[in-house]
């Protein structure tokens, strides 16, 4: 049986006393691809923000690789390899494409490996290589989504 990577149990999130997410439960095992699907306002983004430490939990627990991550902040979770690709474009528009990719590797200290990983991102997303020194704000929406995915992958989730 594949290892459980993420386990969400009884997740609850509230905004100013209003219950935005109540009782969400699921597991993600190694090798699985999971989507959160629902109507506008159903709590999909709120759930992801709670998992990645950007929103506090009102109840429940979240385990990553068998350990509770409840109450940990986003940078602590990135260091453990848990990242989220934003629903929107989520790029730093006043930074170059290369600088955006480097932000994904910010927590790592191995410069040689980072250089190899940037080259790998340019292989996966060749359109980014062509414009690597341009500001991310000059990119189309689809290109910005590619960049956001590349930046998330640079953190080696």
Positions of predicted regions on the chain:
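Conserved structural motif at the start of ABC-family nucleotide-binding domains
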Residues: 6-8, 21
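Conserved ABC ATPase signature
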Residues: 135-139, 143
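ABC ATPase C-loop
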Residues: 152-153
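Helix-to-loop junction immediately C-terminal to a conserved catalytic motif
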Residues: 52
């Amino acid at each position: 049986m594949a290892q459980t990577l993420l386990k969400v149990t009884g997740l609850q999130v509230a905004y100013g006393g209003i219950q935005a997410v109540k009782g969400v439960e699921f597991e993600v095992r190694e090798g699985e691809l999971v989507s959160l699907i629902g109507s506008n306002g159903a709590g999909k983004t709120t759930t992801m923000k709670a998992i990645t430490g950007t929103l506090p939990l009102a109840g429940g627990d979240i385990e990553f690789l068998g350990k509770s991550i409840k109450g940990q902040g986003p940078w602590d979770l990135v260091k453990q390899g848990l990242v989220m690709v934003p629903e929107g474009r989520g790029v730093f528009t006043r930074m170059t494409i290369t600088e955006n990719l480097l932000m994904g590797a910010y927590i790592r200290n191995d410069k040689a490996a980072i250089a190899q990983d940037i080259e790998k991102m340019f292989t996966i997303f060749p359109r980014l290589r062509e414009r690597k020194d341009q500001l991310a704000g000059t990119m189309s929406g689809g290109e910005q989504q590619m960049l956001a995915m590349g930046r998330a992958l640079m953190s080696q989730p």
